């Protein structure tokens, strides 16, 4: 049957082929499911909170829908812009990173909440600078790796230069303080440099340096160590340092195999702080149970897997910059989602860290969707082989 004889409203084969060449359908489907699930869970976890503080049951849900719309619009923009423009803009992206991280610390510019200065007010919106910084760092490092590929693999200075940038950014994040954001940014950078071929002994030396620094902090400020290790036994002080974690564990344990059902969480009723934000996973586990948690993890796994696959396709097509972009986004989303789940389950210290796609918050949701749009652009360009390779193909470790 010819495409012209298709029933009205059905897409032609040519249009479907065009869609497959423009976007990665498995990634699109998984991201869309996570976004929809996030909107549902924000509504479920925040209804009572919105009614109490704003007189509007749907306050947080409505704002999250607005953030999602903005994020989807910006994701479309990221998808439409050729990667070559972002590659050329590398130095400007680095400047923007530093401007954001310094500006938020300036009196009268940054907004302080609960002792942390992490936000820049922009109208009705509060920009949490750590979120765009993650994406900008991925974009900058992808360009750096392409420009200095040989130096990164063969010379120490090629490894040290991006470390100086990451170190300076980490210090600025710690001054806010934002320990979670600093850890994520540093880990993204280390992961991208490792995949680019930096030598193992360099990472070993860096790890030893970090260990010495942590030991110094433990000796100089033991109270900080006590706060960080409170997660090891939250029941020792369940009404102070261990309160949030104990409530999270109660929520997760109450879910059982199949959960209490959507909207039936008890812990979200002002027992669990940040139930709609950093600890949304605990509410999800309570309402959907162990089976729901497995499904959620599977969706995140699909997103990360497709980002890695797209990175490999881009590498084979000779698009080195796009390849490192996709790998960087994969590292970022995998690490942040895993750390958020670990914090909710008491495997890591409690630190402010959102769950991508799900947690309430405009900065996180918008930037996450922009990152997906960027990876979709990598997929789109990977369909056409590059006229020349920007860098040699990655070699396996140990090869000359």
Curated annotation (Swiss-Prot):
Q: Sorted alphabetically, which InterPro entries does this protein's record hold?
A: Cell_cycle_FtsW-rel_CS, FtsW, FtsW/RodA
Annotated membrane topology is: Multi-pass membrane protein
Q: What is its EC number?
A: 2.4.99.28
UniProt pathway: Cell wall biogenesis; peptidoglycan biosynthesis
Which segments cross the bilayer? Answer: 25-45, 64-84, 89-109, 119-139, 154-174, 178-198, 200-220, 279-299, 325-345, 355-375
Enzyme class, broadest EC rank: transferase
Chief localization: membrane
**Cytoplasmic face: residue ranges?**
1-24, 85-88, 140-153, 199, 300-324, 376-400
Keyword annotations for this protein, in alphabetical order, are: Cell cycle, Cell division, Cell inner membrane, Cell membrane, Cell shape, Cell wall biogenesis/degradation, Glycosyltransferase, Membrane, Peptidoglycan synthesis, Transferase, Transmembrane, Transmembrane helix
Instruction: Please tell me one Gene Ontology term that the record gives under cellular component.
Output: cell division site
* A single MF term (Gene Ontology): lipid-linked peptidoglycan transporter activity
**Catalytic reactions on record:** [GlcNAc-(1->4)-Mur2Ac(oyl-L-Ala-gamma-D-Glu-L-Lys-D-Ala-D-Ala)](n)-di-trans,octa-cis-undecaprenyl diphosphate + beta-D-GlcNAc-(1->4)-Mur2Ac(oyl-L-Ala-gamma-D-Glu-L-Lys-D-Ala-D-Ala)-di-trans,octa-cis-undecaprenyl diphosphate = [GlcNAc-(1->4)-Mur2Ac(oyl-L-Ala-gamma-D-Glu-L-Lys-D-Ala-D-Ala)](n+1)-di-trans,octa-cis-undecaprenyl diphosphate + di-trans,octa-cis-undecaprenyl diphosphate + H(+)
Periplasmic side stretches = 46-63, 110-118, 175-177, 221-278, 346-354
What the entry lists under Pfam families is as follows: FTSW_RODA_SPOVE
Compartments it resides in: Cell inner membrane
GO BP terms: namely: cell wall organization; FtsZ-dependent cytokinesis; peptidoglycan biosynthetic process; regulation of cell shape
Annotated family = Belongs to the SEDS family. FtsW subfamily.
Report the protein's function: Peptidoglycan polymerase that is essential for cell division.
Q: Fetch the HAMAP family from UniProt.
A: PGT_FtsW_proteobact
Q: What is this protein called?
A: Probable peptidoglycan glycosyltransferase FtsW
Which species does the entry assign this protein to? Thioalkalivibrio sp. (strain K90mix)
């Amino acid at each position: 049957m010819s495409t012209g004889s298709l029933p009205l409203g059905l897409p032609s084969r040519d249009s479907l082929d065009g869609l497959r060449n423009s976007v990665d359908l498995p990634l699109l489907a998984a991201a869309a499911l996570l976004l929809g699930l996030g909107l549902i869970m924000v509504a479920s976890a925040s209804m009572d909170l919105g009614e109490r503080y704003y007189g509007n049951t749907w306050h947080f849900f409505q704002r999250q829908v607005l953030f999602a719309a903005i994020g989807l619009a910006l994701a479309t923009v990221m998808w439409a812009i050729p990667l070559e423009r972002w590659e050329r803009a590398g130095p400007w992206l680095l400047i923007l990173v530093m401007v954001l991280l310094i500006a938020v610390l300036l009196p009268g510019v940054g907004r302080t909440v609960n002792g942390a200065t992490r936000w820049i007010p922009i109208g009705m919106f509060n920009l949490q600078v750590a979120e765009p910084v993650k994406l900008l760092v991925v974009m900058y490092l992808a360009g750096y790796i392409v420009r200095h590929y040989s130096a990164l693999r063969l010379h120490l200075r090629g490894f040290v230069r991006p470390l100086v940038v990451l170190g300076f950014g980490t210090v600025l994040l710690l001054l806010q303080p934002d320990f979670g954001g600093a850890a994520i940014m540093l880990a993204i950078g280390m992961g991208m440099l490792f995949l680019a071929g930096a030598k193992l002994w360099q990472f070993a030396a860096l790890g030893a340096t970090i260990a010495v620094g942590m030991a110094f902090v433990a000796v100089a400020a033991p109270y900080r160590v006590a706060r960080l290790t409170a997660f090891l036994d939250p029941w020792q002080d369940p009404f102070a340092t261990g309160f949030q974690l104990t409530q999270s564990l109660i929520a997760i344990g109450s879910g059982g195999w199949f959960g209490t059902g959507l909207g039936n969480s008890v812990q979200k009723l002002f027992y669990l702080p940040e139930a709609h934000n950093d600890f949304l996973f605990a509410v999800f586990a309570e309402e959907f149970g162990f089976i729901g948690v497995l499904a959620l993890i599977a969706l995140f796994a699909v997103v990360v897997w497709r980002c890695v696959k797209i990175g490999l396709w881009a590498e084979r097509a000779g698009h080195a910059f796009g390849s490192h972009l996709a790998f960087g986004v994969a590292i970022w989303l995998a690490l942040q989602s895993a750390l958020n789940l670990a914090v909710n389950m008491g495997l890591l210290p409690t630190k402010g860290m959102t769950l991508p796609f799900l947690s309430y918050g405009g900065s996180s949701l918008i930037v996450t969707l922009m990152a997906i749009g960027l990876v979709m652009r990598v997929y789109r360009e990977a369909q056409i082989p590059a006229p020349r390779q920007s860098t040699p193909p990655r070699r396996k470790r140990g090869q000359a």
